[in-house]
């Protein structure tokens, strides 16, 4: 019987790619792929035929090819060879454009066309035909008989592994396959399914012994085997995914997150346990096991995985929910197989990263309670304290085992001691049990700094458990011990507790009344320390004052030598006597902020205070502050009659006003302590000095009145010559000062006249105001001149003064009236000029001639036309409505819509490269230019997505 063998020859369906006929004879041999012994197809490197996108120089993973896409099983029975195709992919395997079923095997025949992958393969139905003229990986099944060159070539390359590229028809040989027992099991499974002889030796059967490998049954592939159908097999000994060597990577947060997302997605599809967190968590564990089984992809295989999981976890929480919905879960797990493949690849990548990192040996800390046995390398626990044995530690724990009655008593004593810290009472002695507990707590704190926390933690927990209360968290030193008896030495004397003066130890300026009172006491004590007393103090009535001075560091030794009564007053700061306080020292003290405004006794005193500033006499300009203080103290109107000093404008008066607040405060505080005899003597002495002072003040007031008259005469006489006007300009500054003096003297005169004087001063002020404005230059605004006229109409006296003005004033009035008349003439001329009438609008429907506007310069558009062909561009209709993102090629600067490139309106990052030309173009650019992105967009069954606004 003639032996017939089948093989695959690569055909190029895409017209834009190179054709098979263009190759030489040697290259045509490279387009043949042998099917002897069975083959596996996919994009994973473990397959016999590896599909790659691009060319031999650029290797990229294809988009519509699975890791393990399909298998071809080869059987040989009675000299008849059969080739069966099995589809295990998501995007389908097609024979003569008919989609294969996943659970069936199709027999290959000579002349069939087999295509791997389709852009819409995930949505195609089995046993239905779908045209795919531009398939990247298409092959024609050819037959060869013995004696033909192709027959010998197929026999030569039966064990080789090749790479097939989408851009070229020639396959690249990457070396022979390695034989393995796993492939023999797969071959035996294929033979037994088709009625072939079964192999006796199997890796799963323990009774059979291994036999030498059959040279006529070579290994077929490097993929992981399925569970055998007709041989005994125990699933608990199964080692999926390399015995799960990636078990460390399974605990990665990224891997767990992907599993949780897949479980949540399946729960949403099911709809029954969306909000049941227990079922979702159990489902994530099931999916974790599903990742390990790489080759179990069909529905029946998924049902087997779910059944085994439910059986192993029988009795767990919510397992019955999964077992009742096994059929639905199997269908969803089959649909989620592409996502499962991505999760599996993530697990492999995480494990590869973990293998690169070299693990360091475990190092034990110095305070560890474990030691390493050199022989076995196992950590064994040892005692923390090497000097103490285990028996001593047990005896120590027994020694602190206090009874419940004593522990309650200790708790009460602790509470009493803590309360004693708040209330100032005498310290109470502690019981012996309490002292033992405190001593051991101190020892525990000392051990805490020396030994490991294992020993200290046991110790502290035992103490807290014995005492039946919350452990003490504060410092142990807070709990006081028994009090000591009070003894005093014979040579030492008791000292009274004294309050610290707040003013000396604070930065306050006396903002409250209490601070002000304490301030006065401290000020008086400071005066006592600096000045001292002229006469010995006398006891006052009532006995409230004491002779104890304010203690200082220098007087501390002197203070301890004298005994002080027990019933001494708490505030030891003494009051000051009026006779022992010089007024000059009192006036130099700072004035509190809350002290009242000082007042003057009468109008005469106001004149006496204000006149020294106006008199040229230096003696009267700086009066003696002692005399002023005595005058204010001796007069009876110091308490009753008060007149404000707000109108005192002279500098000397302000300096006197700064002196008076402290004088008024000190005199008010000392007046209560003065005796009647001292007051009488003070009045006699002060009255004599007052008379002398008043005479000097009267003389100075007469001289000031003369100066005021001279100033008025000088201001009233006009300058008739230019020389005199220049002199007047030179004396402007001096006249301003004299006018201020004039106002101050007029205010002082108004105090003597009373109410009638107030009215006259108002008129004088108005008259002065009007004359000053009249002397201003004519370059000022007219509004001020109108105000002057209104002021002239107010009072008759002002009008009379203006009539009697000298010749210079008349000239200015004439100039003012002339300027006003000129302004009126200008206004009338403006009114006489008639404004030009605007042209009337013509009625009718005739359009007005448009004005010629300059055309703006034409600007080039920022973005050009999309580099994708017009028929494949899916973003043109969204350019006006959506804010589309663009990307340009780094070589030719050709612009592309990001939506046309990868169906996502997210800008490229700076570290990402985009190339549409050159030797290494980007995969996304090639897909967009080849129309794959457009085809994928059109193949979407549901509503097409719309580009969303990109977040900048």
Swiss-Prot record:
Q: Any idea where the FHA domain is?
A: 39-100
Q: Which ranges are annotated Low complexity under compositional bias? A: 662-679, 715-724
* Gene3D superfamilies referenced in this protein's UniProt entry, alphabetically: 2.60.200.20, Zinc/RING finger domain, C3HC4 (zinc finger)
Write down the superkingdom of origin.
Answer: Eukaryota
Compositionally skewed regions (Acidic residues) per UniProt: 523-537, 789-800
| Primary localization class, coarse | nucleus
Q: Which GO terms describe its cellular component?
A: nucleus
Q: Name one Pfam family in it.
A: FHA
UniProt entry keywords in alphabetical sequence: Nucleus, Transcription, Transcription regulation
Record's function text: Potential transcription factor that may play a role in the regulation of genes involved in cell cycle G1/S transition. May bind to regulatory elements of genes.
Q: Which PANTHER family match?
A: TRANSCRIPTION FACTOR 19
What is the protein's given name?
Germ layers disorganized gldi-3
- This protein's species is Caenorhabditis elegans
């Amino acid at each position: 019987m003639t032996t017939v063998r089948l093989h695959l020859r690569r055909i190029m369906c895409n017209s834009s790619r190179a054709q098979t006929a263009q190759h030489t004879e040697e290259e045509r041999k490279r387009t043949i792929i042998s099917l002897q012994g069975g083959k596996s197809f996919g994009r994973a490197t473990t397959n016999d035929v590896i599909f790659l996108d691009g060319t031999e120089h650029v290797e990229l993973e294809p988009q519509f090819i699975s890791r393990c896409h399909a298998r071809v099983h080869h059987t040989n029975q009675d000299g008849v060879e059969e080739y069966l195709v099995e589809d295990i992919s998501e995007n389908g395997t097609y024979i003569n454009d008919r989609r294969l079923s996943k659970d069936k095997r199709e027999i290959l025949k000579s002349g069939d066309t087999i295509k791997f992958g389709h852009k819409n393969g995930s949505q195609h139905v089995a046993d239905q035909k779908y045209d795919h003229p531009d398939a990247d990986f298409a092959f024609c099944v050819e037959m060869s008989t013995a004696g033909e060159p192709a027959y010998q070539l197929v026999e030569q390359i039966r064990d080789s592994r090749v790479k097939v590229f989408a851009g070229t028809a020639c396959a690249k040989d990457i070396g022979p396959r390695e034989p393995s027992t796993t492939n023999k099991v797969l071959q035996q499974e294929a033979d037994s399914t088709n009625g072939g002889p079964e192999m006796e030796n199997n890796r799963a059967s323990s009774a059979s012994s291994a036999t030498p490998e059959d040279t006529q049954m070579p290994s077929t592939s490097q993929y992981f085997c399925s569970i055998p159908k007709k041989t005994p097999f125990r699933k608990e000994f199964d080692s999926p995914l390399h015995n799960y060597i990636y078990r460390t990577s399974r605990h990665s947060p990224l891997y767990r997150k992907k599993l949780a997302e897949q479980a949540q997605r399946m729960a949403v599809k099911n709809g029954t346990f969306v909000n049941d967190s227990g079922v979702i968590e159990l489902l994530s564990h099931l999916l974790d096991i599903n990742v390990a089984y790489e080759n179990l992809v069909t529905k029946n295989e998924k049902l087997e995985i779910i059944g085994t999981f439910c059986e192993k976890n029988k009795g767990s929480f919510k397992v019955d929910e999964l077992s009742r919905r096994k059929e639905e879960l199997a269908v969803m797990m089959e649909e989620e197989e592409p996502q499962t493949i991505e999760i599996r690849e993530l697990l492999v990548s995480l494990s590869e990263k973990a293998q690169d990192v070299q693990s360091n040996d475990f190092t034990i800390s110095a305070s560890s309670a474990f030691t390493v046995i050199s022989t076995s390398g196992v950590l064994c626990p040892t005692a923390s304290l090497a000097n103490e044995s285990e028996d001593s530690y047990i005896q120590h724990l027994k020694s602190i085992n206090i009874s419940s009655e004593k522990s309650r008593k200790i708790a009460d004593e602790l509470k009493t001691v803590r309360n004693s810290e708040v209330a100032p009472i005498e310290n109470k002695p502690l019981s012996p049990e309490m002292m033992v507990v405190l001593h051991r707590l101190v020892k525990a704190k000392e051990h805490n700094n020396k030994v490991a926390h294992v020993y200290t933690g046991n110790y502290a927990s035992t103490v807290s458990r014995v005492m039946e209360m919350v452990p003490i968290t504060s410092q142990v030193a807070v709990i006081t011990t028994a009090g000591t008896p009070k003894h005093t030495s014979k040579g030492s004397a008791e000292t009274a507790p004294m309050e610290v003066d707040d003013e000396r130890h604070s930065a306050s300026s006396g903002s409250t009344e209490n601070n002000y009172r304490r301030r006065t006491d401290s000020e008086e004590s400071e005066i006592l320390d600096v000045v001292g007393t002229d006469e010995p103090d006398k006891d006052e009535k009532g006995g409230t004052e004491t002779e104890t001075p304010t203690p200082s560091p220098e007087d501390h030794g002197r203070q301890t030598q004298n005994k002080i009564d027990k019933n001494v007053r708490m505030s030891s700061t003494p009051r000051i006597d009026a006779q022992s306080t010089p007024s000059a020292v009192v006036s130099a003290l700072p004035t509190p902020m809350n002290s009242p405004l000082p007042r003057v006794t009468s109008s005469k005193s106001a004149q006496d205070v204000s006149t020294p500033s106006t008199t040229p006499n230096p003696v009267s300009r700086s009066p003696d502050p002692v005399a002023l203080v005595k005058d204010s103290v001796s007069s009876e109107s110091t308490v009753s009659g008060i007149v404000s000093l707000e109108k005192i404008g002279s500098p000397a008066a302000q300096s006197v006003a700064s002196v008076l607040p402290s004088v008024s405060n000190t005199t008010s505080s000392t007046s209560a302590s003065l005796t009647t005899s001292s007051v009488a003597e003070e009045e006699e002495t002060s009255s004599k000095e007052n008379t002398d002072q008043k005479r000097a003040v009267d003389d100075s007031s007469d001289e000031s009145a003369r100066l005021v008259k001279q100033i008025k005469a000088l201001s009233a006489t006009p300058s008739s010559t230019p020389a005199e006007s220049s002199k007047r300009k030179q004396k402007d500054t001096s006249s301003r000062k004299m006018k201020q003096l004039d106002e101050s003297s007029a205010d002082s005169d108004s105090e003597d006249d009373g109410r009638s004087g107030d009215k006259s001063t108002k008129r004088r002020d108005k008259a002065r105001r009007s004359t000053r404005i009249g002397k201003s230059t004519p370059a000022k605004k007219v509004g001020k001149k109108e105000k002057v006229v209104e002021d002239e109409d107010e009072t008759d006296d002002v009008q009379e003064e203006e009539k009697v003005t000298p010749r210079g004033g008349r000239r200015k009035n004439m100039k003012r009236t002339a300027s006003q008349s000129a302004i009126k003439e200008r206004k009338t001329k403006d009114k006489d000029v008639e404004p030009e009438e605007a042209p009337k609008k013509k009625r009718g429907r005739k359009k007005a001639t448009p004005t010629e506007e300059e055309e703006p310069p034409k600007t080039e558009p920022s973005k050009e036309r999309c580099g994708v062909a017009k028929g494949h561009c899916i973003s043109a209709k969204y350019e006006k409505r959506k804010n589309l993102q663009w990307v340009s090629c780094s070589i030719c600067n050709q612009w592309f819509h990001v939506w046309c490139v990868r169906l996502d309106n997210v800008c490229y990052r700076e570290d990402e490269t985009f190339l549409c030309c050159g030797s290494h173009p980007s995969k996304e650019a090639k897909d967009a230019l080849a129309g794959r992105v457009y085809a994928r967009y059109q193949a979407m069954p549901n509503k097409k997505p719309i580009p969303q606004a990109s977040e900048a």
